[in-house]
Design a protein with these regions (language model features):
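Short S/T/G/P-enriched beta-strand
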Residues: 29-66, 74, 138-158
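Small-residue (G/S/T/A) turn/hinge positions that recur once per unit in extracellular repeat modules
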Residues: 49-50, 99-103
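Beta-strand-rich structural segments
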Residues: 63-78, 218-222
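Extracellular/luminal low-complexity segments enriched in Ser/Thr/Pro
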Residues: 103-118
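Glycine-centered low-complexity coil/loop motifs and glycine-rich tracts
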Residues: 146-214, 227-314, 318-349
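Bacterial N-terminal signal peptides that target proteins for export
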Residues: 2-17
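Short flexible loop/turn segments that cap and initiate beta-strands
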Residues: 72-100, 231, 249-251
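Short, aromatic- and glycine-rich surface loops/edge beta-strands on solvent-exposed regions
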Residues: 119-132
Length: 349
């Protein structure tokens, strides 16, 4: 390949990289449309519309799920929304009206973590195209509870220690004064001054200890039915209560109360370098060079903090829950084993 083609290829590569960078940084829709990477729906003659959830028709509390909308035009060509659908249709050209679930500007649905907000309801979305009242897609979204839920009430991690300050470099010694080497008038050059020592680096600070995991209390009641559900409320001092609905046939709830990790010790500062000795002055004889100063010692690294202690977990459950206790799991490592208390528990909401 001759030099001319090499230069041309470089220009093309640089231009393509610059365009890609501009699109990545600005997300410029106009550029994407100009390049044919996106299409405005108003420029198409579409006849059908359909909505779907590629990750499955149902959602669990706390889950997100991308929405995909598909169109067919008069020629039979299929057009799909951007994002999860990897298509060209812009979400900004559509109106998505959600119920129970929420939706963001990229067509991603979300069901609230708190099951009380969706209890006894199904999610619903309606997709319409402004200016085209004949195009409408509706989608019902059942709520599922047969998934692994988890809640962590762990202690806070310790703070990291401060790094030590670096030592100061020593100053260089002064050069010796000049003598002379003239016949009958020789004089010795002066000795160079010694460099000063570098100072020691500061010690790193110790890392803070991790916080203890709090004592956790779990209340569990049974909601009877053709497919029984476990109502659970998990609480800890100073923490917001967490609510769960769990289908024990496939679902589970894991409760964690571990101590926070200790913070890392700070690094010791580097010792300062000794100053160089000054040069001996010229003369007959020349002066001696000064001695270089000693380097300072590096500071000691700080000690890591200790991990916090793991919290206790107490599970209070209604007698009707006992056959389903295998769906309740705990993790508090070396802390005492969870305490189980069987006593009547009324419906929790």
């Amino acid at each position: 390949m001759n030099e001319r083609w090499v230069q041309l290829w470089r220009r093309i590569s640089i231009g393509a990289w610059g365009l890609a960078a501009a699109m990545g940084l600005t997300g410029c829709t106009a550029i994407k449309v100009k390049l044919g990477m996106r299409v405005h729906l108003i420029n198409l003659t579409v006849t059908t519309i359909a909505a779907s959830l590629p990750n499955g028709p149902a959602m669990a509390p706390g889950e997100t799920s991308p929405l995909v909308v598909t169109f067919t035009d008069t020629s039979g060509k299929v057009w799909v929304t951007e994002g999860e659908g990897n298509g060209k249709i812009l979400w900004s050209d559509l109106t998505v009206t959600p119920s129970v679930v929420t939706v963001n500007k990229k067509g991603v649905l979300r069901l609230a973590h708190d099951p009380r907000k969706s209890d006894g309801q199904a999610g619903h979305v309606e997709v319409t195209v402004p200016g085209h009242p004949d195009l409408k897609a509706a989608l019902d979204i059942p709520v599922r509870y047969d998934v692994p839920f988890a809640v962590s009430f762990n202690g806070a991690n310790g703070s990291s220690g401060m790094d030590g300050m670096s030592g100061t470099d020593g100053t260089s010694g002064l050069s010796g004064s000049s003598g002379s080497c003239v016949p009958d008038h020789n004089s010795a050059g002066g000795d160079g001054g010694n460099g000063s020592d570098g100072t020691d680096g500061g010690n790193g600070g110790d890392g803070g200890n991790g916080g203890d995991g709090p004592p956790v209390r779990v209340l569990i009641a049974l909601r009877p039915g053709a497919r029984p559900l476990l109502q659970a409320v998990v609480s800890a001092p100073g923490r917001k209560d967490r609510h769960f609905l769990v289908d024990p046939q496939g679902g589970s709830l894991t409760i964690t109360s571990n101590g926070g990790a200790g913070g890392s010790g700070g690094r010791g500062g580097k010792g300062g370098r000794g100053g160089s000795g000054g040069s001996g002055g010229f003369g007959c004889p020349s002066g001696s060079n000064g001695r270089s100063g000693s380097d300072g010692h590096d500071g000691r690294s700080g000690s890591d903090g200790y991990s916090g202690r793991n919290g206790t977990i107490t599970i209070v459950y209604d007698p009707a829950v006992k056959p389903y206790l295998a769906a309740i799991k705990t993790s508090n490592k070396s802390a005492p084993a969870p305490v189980y208390q069987e006593t009547p528990v009324a419906p929790l909401w």
